[in-house]
Amino acid sequence: MPKPRKCQIAVDATPYYHCVSRCVRRAFLCGLDPYTQVSYEHRRGWVEQKILALGQVFCIDVCAYAVMSNHYHVVLFINSSEQAQLTDFEVLERWSQLFRGNLIVNRYVRGDDLCEAELYVVNQVAELWRERLGNISWFMKVLNEHIAREANREDVCTGKFWEPDADQGFKSQALLDDKALAACLAYVDLNPIRAKMAESPETSEHTSAKKWIDAAKRTKSNALSLNQPNILLPFIGNPRESMPIGLPFKLTDYLDLLYWTGCILRHDKRGAIDESLPPILKRLKIEPKNWLQNVKYFETNFKVMAGSLSSVKFKCTHLGYQRVPATSPILT
């Protein structure tokens, strides 16, 4: 029996999660439907824009994403420190961008004078909404409901648009350590290349990889580091003391890893791997052949959690699992 979402997502175990939603009805989310020859390419923009917009409202940062023909991937980071530091007013203002709220909250946001009882209600509502702003299930619920309504309106039909996996129509995988995080980021960003929808990361439309590369190209020649898009969780370099919030890799190293991996996958050169390995693989001590296997079959190799055996055991103990799920040897 599948574990409920609250037993799959626990920020104390890891703040990083990979989420996937797939369409039902045989309908295409985006791209050209080969059965009807109808193009839904414009829907890629819907999904991408909504993912990035929600990342600015929720206390959840977008690390990576890829919008495919009948599904999409997104890697999310639960920003607990931002969630805790928001004032009640900021919480109410953010949530009001998504929903209309109630009369008392709207009066408070407008700056109207409230009595003590009304202020108590506002405080209770703010605490509830603060929790939701750091809740991945709510992030995915808002995203999927918006896209489903738009698609159903365009298709002139009703009914479910997303596969009913658990709740909110999405699957999630906890990314328990840096090895799992690096593998999942590359798995998501290289989706179009594996599906032969693109030749390289910079031509992969509606992916975080293209966002990173486009921003890096705008870097001035005298800059000390590459430009990064402010709508994605930034790369902050290798782990060290007093690290700011961000992805624990160098952006240059990650882009090198994407190009190296993408080239091998595109030309199927698994038997002739270049000896000059990307720095990330060296630092994380991942065997190249295992890495390629992982980037191709990440969802198959791991179910609700991904990481080394020690990381998986730690999370299972933390969540009170009766047994440790099978772990791919790729990250052990």
Q: Which residues does each PLM region occupy?
A:
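Short catalytic/metal-binding and nucleic-acid-binding patches
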Residues: 1-332
